[in-house]
């Protein structure tokens, strides 16, 4: 294990993976704990119950309590959205337009063809998709509003054909968020934040319509509220489990340390519980990146936040690139950046990652904003079972089958035997009666 002497907490330590025990290796890939405390769970449960029983009155009380805002009209008017659009500069509008164009292009390409096939003569099976009727989008506010998340959620919901799209964001809602909503054709915007916004969308109030599925990131209270409503019969489905943002960078000896450092810091500045990991077979590169991180930190407006994140982050020196991939697959990062000389050749070996960025010229921020891929990604190891958000998340699949008389006659013995094996007599009879009717007609 080698040390350097800069002051970025544990990120200043270069860890030799080969010299670590299995338990030490496991600890190195452990994420910061995010389990909701009993207090958060109880507070959120009370908020959900209160909103369910008191509706808009509870929403106004919580806005005053948590957001320090007296909200009269919960819904933002068309005039307010138009005014926000007028205040916003053309430069930002043009940037959003380009981002939307690329997001549209990528998500349009995800449309599934209808599956229509005869599995055997006279037995036709189809798979068709339908949009989820009503979806709710939660967009965080505060010191760093996220209009890009509006684009990432609003664009696929529109392409999918969702009949109703509801957006909630804490008051006062930033002009950028309101304009992004307008750009995506979202007309129902509500100035609501926190667990109360999730409750309003899950259960519905006089002002806020009940939705079928809720999308979007948030703090610990929002995350816990989404978890709770997804487990209630009268609640709503959710996009995916959420955790702090994270990135893992694999760099070889030819990588540019400043580029690698900038990508690591792009995630570290998200929040103190973010985690960033550098994997490299080159100890010289590892030290150069650690030094570049320290140098760039001094230029960041959110340097204090980034430093806190770096305290639970890692610089790991592996045996070779193959081992880097093995470690990355074990960790399953939200963002995986591969800055190697033949990055594309490694893709087939990657089994778990939310979004992958190949080469020196593919910064993680490109995917965050404008390349076209979605930036709503599984975190906290959920990449082993969850996918990046896409068009399919705003849709549902249905299957259709149609049997001709001859098709049923051919398949009937198979169905009857299996139904009998499971001792489901009515299932068997549904076939036997039809077969008898067909034989009478013959």
UniProtKB/Swiss-Prot annotation:
Cellular component GO terms held in the UniProt record: cytosol
Cofactor(s) this protein requires: Zn(2+)
Cofactor-binding details, from the entry: Binds 1 zinc ion per subunit.
Binding site for Zn(2+): 267, 270, 368, 427
InterPro entries attached to this UniProt entry: Ald_DH/histidinol_DH, Histidinol_DH_CS, Histidinol_DH_monofunct, Hstdl_DH
Keywords linked to the UniProt accession: Amino-acid biosynthesis, Histidine biosynthesis, Metal-binding, NAD, Oxidoreductase, Zinc
Sample GO molecular function, one term: histidinol dehydrogenase activity
Pfam families, alphabetized: Histidinol_dh
Role according to the record: Catalyzes the sequential NAD-dependent oxidations of L-histidinol to L-histidinaldehyde and then to L-histidine.
Protein name (database record): Histidinol dehydrogenase
Gene: hisD
């Amino acid at each position: 294990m080698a040390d350097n002497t800069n002051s970025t907490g544990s990120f200043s330590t270069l860890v030799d993976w080969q010299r670590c025990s299995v338990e030490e290796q496991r600890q190195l890939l452990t994420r910061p704990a995010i389990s909701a405390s009993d207090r958060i769970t109880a507070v959120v449960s009370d908020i959900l119950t209160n909103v369910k029983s008191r509706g808009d009155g509870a929403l106004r009380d919580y806005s005053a309590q948590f957001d320090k805002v007296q909200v009269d009209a919960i819904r933002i008017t068309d005039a307010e959205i138009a005014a926000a659009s007028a205040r916003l500069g053309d430069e930002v509008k043009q940037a959003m337009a380009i981002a939307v164009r690329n997001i549209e292009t990528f998500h349009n390409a995800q449309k599934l063809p209808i599956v229509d096939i005869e599995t055997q003569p006279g037995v036709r099976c189809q798979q068709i998709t339908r949009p989820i009727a009503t979806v709710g989008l939660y967009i965080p506010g505060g010191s760093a509003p996220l209009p890009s998340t509006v684009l990432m959620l609003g664009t696929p919901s529109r392409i999918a054909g969702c009949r109703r799209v509801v957006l909630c964001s804490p008051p006062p809602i930033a002009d950028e968020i309101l304009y992004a909503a307008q750009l995506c054709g979202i007309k129902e915007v509500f100035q609501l934040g926190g667990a109360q916004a999730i409750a309003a969308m899950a259960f519905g109030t006089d002002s806020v319509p009940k939705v079928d599925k809720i999308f979007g990131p948030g703090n610990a209270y929002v995350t816990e509220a989404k978890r709770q409503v997804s487990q209630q019969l009268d609640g709503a489905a959710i996009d995916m489990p959420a955790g702090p943002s994270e990135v893992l960078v694999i760099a070889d000896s030819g990588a540019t340390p400043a580029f690698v450092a900038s990508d690591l810091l792009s995630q570290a500045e998200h929040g103190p519980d973010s985690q960033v990991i550098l994997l490299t077979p080159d100890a010289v590169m590892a030290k150069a990146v650690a030094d570049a991180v320290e140098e760039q930190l001094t230029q960041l407006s959110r340097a204090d936040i980034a430093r806190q994140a770096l305290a639970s982050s890692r610089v790991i020196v592996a045996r070779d690139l193959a081992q880097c991939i093995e470690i990355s697959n074990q960790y399953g990062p939200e963002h995986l950046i591969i800055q190697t000389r033949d990055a594309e050749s490694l893709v087939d070996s990657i089994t778990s990652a939310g979004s992958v960025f190949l080469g020196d010229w593919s910064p993680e921020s490109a995917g965050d904003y404008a390349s076209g891929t979605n930036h709503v990604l599984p975190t906290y190891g959920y990449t082993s079972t969850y996918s990046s958000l896409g068009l399919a998340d705003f849709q549902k699949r249905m299957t259709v089958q149609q049997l001709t008389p001859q098709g049923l006659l051919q398949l009937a013995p198979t169905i009857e035997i299996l139904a009998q094996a499971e001792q489901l007599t009515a299932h068997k009879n549904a076939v036997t009666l039809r077969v008898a009717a067909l034989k009478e007609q013959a």
